[in-house]
UniProtKB/Swiss-Prot annotation:
Keyword set includes Protease: no
GO molecular-function terms, A-Z: ATP binding; GMP synthase activity
Encoding gene, per UniProt annotation: guaA
Originating species: Parasynechococcus marenigrum (strain WH8102)
Cross-referenced InterPro entries: Class_I_gatase-like, GATASE, GMP_synth_C, GMP_synth_GATase, GMP_synthase, GMPS_ATP_PPase_dom, Rossmann-like_a/b/a_fold
Name used for this protein in its record: GMP synthase [glutamine-hydrolyzing]
Chain positions recorded as ATP binding sites: 232-238
Pathway assigned in UniProt: Purine metabolism; GMP biosynthesis; GMP from XMP (L-Gln route): step 1/1
Catalytic EC class: ligase
Domain Glutamine amidotransferase type-1: 13-204
Active site: 90, 178, 180
Subunit structure, interactors included: Homodimer.
Length: 528
């Protein structure tokens, strides 16, 4: 059965301690795919804190450091005495080996990066159903030179003698590869072995269980008080609206603030969809001129986000006085939102876990300090794919469930530089063409996001024997599972040609279309 804390919140069955790996959150996703709840915590979480959570298992993530470096991040050594199964991944394995008396050194041969066939020495326990020769993803420059007392080898590769190790009696396991990445062909089999057979977890992290628990937590938190929801029409806020409607009924008021940065036709679609089709009343607020005037002369992307976030709350506060009183503001904040805004990195000079801000998230980074609402964020522990499952279970139609993600600040952060009405109209028309053609090609649901970006430069062109000097549009299409990482989508040439021709011929002020082929990382999906 699932465990709950005294405040009704579900306790994690698997805790991932993060040592700065880019894959830490991916480990959490993979564990959740086995229907077992997992969370990511800082590597400095103490053994006593972990004992209080009563997890069934602990995973030590990879990381960019070397365990023998002066300021290497270290876990509480008392963790090894908790009696809880531990799986160390890459850096996590090396840390386990070193702290328990083994030796880790820089690889004497070649460092191992990329795919490598795994040769299984002991096909039982952790490596049950992991076939010999399976491809595993390697990313390490250090290796284990001597195992601690009581440890045995489970598998090796051509360049890594100790690719998987274990102390079977103490249920301590380590793998030098990354089972969580898609390139590791039997990675999920290994994760299931650890979660189910070694830790004894039960598959109780299901969509229906989450809904029941979230409804109970919201009811407990809110009581008889009223909640105001910022509805955008995307899958996150729409799922949140359906969930809150189920939990608190008419205590929920949905408000759609038209800030003027939506895609073409979306405000009208949103009002018709919720108000008429699903009988969820939505208060429509036309604040277009208010927002555009606040952004006059603003070019810095962080400043734009902060201004939009602050203005959103100001409008909410004003409208809540008219419609309220309201005590709570509901937000569709997701787990990746929190992760991306907070950062999960390790300072190489101090070994401390620090926040490295990429860009502030519109939900968690733009709130004013004098916020008059308490926050309700029942989706903040979910990944995007989990939100879609919840939406479907609540009866949200596929046209909403499978909509491409759209940022809270809208087109304002897809226009680089100053935002003007002219640029907004231009980008709306171009963006509509992109979405129309991708739908027509039957590729809309194969792509994570597809949109247009307007650049703050002009280029020379020739149209009708006349010189033009107009804006370029960037075509940005990416494939992803959860938005944490992404690759650029390989669209057919004919489709890209059609999109380019239509934009140049139909959108006034544009004479060039370029393609963004940057993955995340090193880039981000959005340009601002």
């Amino acid at each position: 059965m699932s465990q709950s804390s005294s405040d009704g919140q579900r306790q994690p069955a698997i805790v991932i301690l993060d040592f700065g790996s880019q894959y830490s959150e991916l480990i959490a996703r993979r564990v959740r795919e086995t229907e077992v709840f997992s969370v990511v915590l800082g590597y400095s979480t103490s053994a006593e804190e972990l004992r209080a959570m009563q997890p069934k298992g602990i995973v030590l993530s990879g990381g960019p450091s070397s365990v023998y470096a002066e300021h290497a991040p270290l876990c509480d050594p008392a963790i090894w005495e908790l009696g809880i199964p531990v799986l160390g991944v890459c850096y996590g394995m090396q840390l386990m080996v070193q702290q328990l008396g083994g030796v880790v050194e820089a690889a004497s041969g070649k460092a191992e990066y990329g795919k490598a066939p795994l040769e299984v020495d002991d096909p039982t326990d952790l490596l049950t159903n992991v076939t010999g020769g399976s491809t595993m993803w390697m990313s390490h420059g250090d290796s284990v030179k001597a195992l601690p007392e009581g440890f045995v080898r489970l598998a090796h590769t051509a360049n890594t003698p100790e690719a998987a190790v274990a102390h079977l009696q103490r249920r301590l396991y380590g793998v030098q590869f990354h089972p969580e990445v898609v390139h590791s062909t039997c990675g999920m089999a290994l994760i299931r072995n650890f979660v189910y057979h070694i830790c004894g977890c039960e598959p109780d992290w299901t969509t229906s269980a989450f809904i029941d628990e979230a409804v109970a937590v919201v009811r407990e938190q809110v009581g008889e008080k009223r909640v105001l929801l910022a509805l955008s029409g995307g899958v996150d806020s729409s799922t949140l609206a359906f969930l809150l409607k189920k939990a608190i009924g008419d205590q929920l008021t949905c408000m759609f603030i038209d800030q003027g940065f939506m895609r073409k036709g979306e405000p009208e679609f949103l009002m018709d969809f919720f108000d008429r089709k699903f009988n969820i009343h939505v208060e429509y607020i036309n604040a277009r001129q208010r927002f555009i005037s606040k952004l006059k002369g603003i070019t810095d992307p962080e400043e734009k986000r902060k201004i939009i976030g602050t203005e959103f709350i100001r409008v909410f506060e004003e409208e809540s006085k008219r419609l309220g009183p309201f005590d709570y503001l509901a937000q569709g904040t997701l787990y990746p939102d929190v992760i991306e805004s907070a950062g999960t990195n390790v300072d190489p000079k101090t070994g401390e876990r620090v926040a490295v801000k990429i860009k502030s998230h519109h939900n968690v980074g733009g709130l004013p300090k004098d916020l008059q609402f308490k926050l309700v964020e029942p989706l903040r522990k979910l990944f995007k794919d989990e939100v879609r499952k919840v939406g479907r279970a609540l009866g949200l139609p596929e046209e909403i469930v499978r909509r491409h993600p759209f940022p809270g600040p809208g087109l304002a952060i897809r226009i680089l530089g100053e935002v003007t009405d002219e640029k907004l109209n231009c980008l709306r028309d171009a963006d509509l063409i992109v979405r129309e053609e991708i739908r027509e090609a039957g590729l809309y649901h194969e792509i994570w996001q597809a949109f247009a970006v307007l650049l703050p430069v002009r280029s020379v062109g020739v149209m009708g024997d006349k010189r033009t000097y107009a804006w370029p549009i960037v075509l940005r299409c990416v494939s992803s599972e959860d938005g944490m990482t992404a690759d650029w989508s390989r669209l057919p040439y004919d489709l890209m040609e059609t999109i380019s021709n239509r934009i140049v011929n139909e959108v006034k002020g544009v004479n060039r279309v370029v393609l963004d082929i940057t993955s995340k990382p090193p880039g981000t999906i959005e340009w601002e």
